[in-house]
From Swiss-Prot:
CDD domains: Mavicyanin (cd11014)
Record-given protein name: Stellacyanin
Domain Phytocyanin: residue ranges: 1-105
Any GO CC annotation of this UniProt entry: plasma membrane
Residues bearing glycans: N28, N60, N102
Entries under PROSITE patterns matching the protein: COPPER_BLUE, PHYTOCYANIN
Disulfide bond entries: C59-C93
Amino acid sequence: TVYTVGDSAGWKVPFFGDVDYDWKWASNKTFHIGDVLVFKYDRRFHNVDKVTQKNYQSCNDTTPIASYNTGBBRINLKTVGQKYYICGVPKHCDLGQKVHINVTVRS
């Protein structure tokens, strides 16, 4: 399954609760190995950093596991477990531009 993060809103700083990546977007989806996350955004203003849980919680992007900046990033989910993504532009993560998912094996 291909999932566009934020659906039609895409990957952006949430304004007035228009997007809630964890509670409204990710919480009602089941992610499996083989699925694809698509981050759509204006690369002049945003990016995507895969980070650890600790860095997700503190919005620290100084040591990302991986970085993406095409504006149309396709991330293949290849391993099980918790995955954490933030926007590395200053203050964007603090304002809610972050998402975490749990990848499981398809039964």
